[in-house]
């Protein structure tokens, strides 16, 4: 089964539990903390090692979860994923869970790349314009890429708005290459 399909199935199941129990935010926080915990290289090597038996993995993770203030729902979910030998999918499950939870909350995530760091007022103006255009609350993920020369690129949902100088130069170049040259004779 493909990574995306596995992650989607587990994320959807946890989402439904979170909606039913009204613990969506808490589950997102707990799963995020767990994914951060297993980012530690030694723990990752242990957890993802194929010859370590499931019982040992569940024992160690169970002890870690007991010290980290995880709800019974989060603990049961994490241990179920390990029991099914899907531990290498935790980061993908978390990303998919956040995406699905944001959809339920009517939140759109937008990735904004600009040539220079934007001032807080510019960020807020961009956020409000995107919110007005989408009808959703907007969470911005900002990045800086000097190669854009100027302007910015906004990606959200299945849309990309390229307002960068580098993008305009690329478009102009492609337009010139497609245009037939006039005959000089």
Swiss-Prot record:
Q: How does it sit in the membrane?
A: Peripheral membrane protein
Q: Which GO terms describe its molecular function?
A: proton-transporting ATP synthase activity, rotational mechanism
- Coiled coil, from the record: none
Key word Ion transport present: yes
Q: Which UniProt keywords apply?
A: ATP synthesis, Cell membrane, CF(1), Hydrogen ion transport, Ion transport, Membrane, Transport
Q: Which SUPFAM superfamilies match?
A: N-terminal domain of the delta subunit of the F1F0-ATP synthase
- Tell me any Pfam family this protein matches: OSCP
Q: State the GO CC annotations.
A: plasma membrane; proton-transporting ATP synthase complex
Tell me the compartments it is located in.
Cell membrane
Q: Which domain of life is it from?
A: Bacteria
Q: Which InterPro entries match?
A: ATP_synth_OSCP/delta_N_sf, ATPase_OSCP/dsu
Q: What does this protein do?
A: F(1)F(0) ATP synthase produces ATP from ADP in the presence of a proton or sodium gradient. F-type ATPases consist of two structural domains, F(1) containing the extramembraneous catalytic core and F(0) containing the membrane proton channel, linked together by a central stalk and a peripheral stalk. During catalysis, ATP synthesis in the catalytic domain of F(1) is coupled via a rotary mechanism of the central stalk subunits to proton translocation.
HAMAP family listed in its UniProt record: ATP_synth_delta_bact (MF_01416)
Quaternary state and interactors: F-type ATPases have 2 components, F(1) - the catalytic core - and F(0) - the membrane proton channel. F(1) has five subunits: alpha(3), beta(3), gamma(1), delta(1), epsilon(1). CF(0) has four main subunits: a(1), b(2) and c(10-14). The alpha and beta chains form an alternating ring which encloses part of the gamma chain. F(1) is attached to F(0) by a central stalk formed by the gamma and epsilon chains, while a peripheral stalk is formed by the delta and b chains.
**Family membership:** Belongs to the ATPase delta chain family.
Q: Under which name does UniProt file this protein?
A: ATP synthase subunit delta
What is the organism of origin for this protein? Heliobacterium modesticaldum (strain ATCC 51547 / Ice1)
């Amino acid at each position: 089964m493909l990574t995306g399909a596995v992650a989607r199935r587990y994320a959807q199941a946890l989402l439904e539990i979170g909606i039913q129990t009204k613990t969506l935010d808490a589950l997102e926080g707990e799963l995020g903390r767990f994914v951060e915990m297993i980012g530690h290289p030694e723990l990752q090597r242990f957890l993802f090692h194929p010859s370590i038996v499931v019982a040992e993995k569940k024992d160690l993770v169970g002890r870690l979860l007991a010290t980290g203030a995880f709800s019974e729902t989060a603990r049961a979910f994490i241990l179920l994923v390990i029991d099914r030998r899907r531990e290498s999918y935790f980061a993908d499950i978390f990303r998919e869970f956040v995406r699905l939870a944001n959809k339920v909350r009517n939140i759109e995530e937008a990735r904004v790349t600009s040539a220079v760091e934007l001032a807080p007022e510019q960020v807020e103006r961009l956020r409000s314009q995107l919110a007005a255009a989408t009808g959703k609350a907007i969470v911005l993920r900002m990045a800086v890429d000097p190669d854009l020369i100027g302007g910015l690129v906004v990606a959200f949902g299945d849309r990309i708005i390229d307002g960068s100088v580098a993008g305009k130069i690329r478009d102009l170049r492609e337009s010139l290459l497609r245009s037939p040259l006039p005959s000089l004779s």
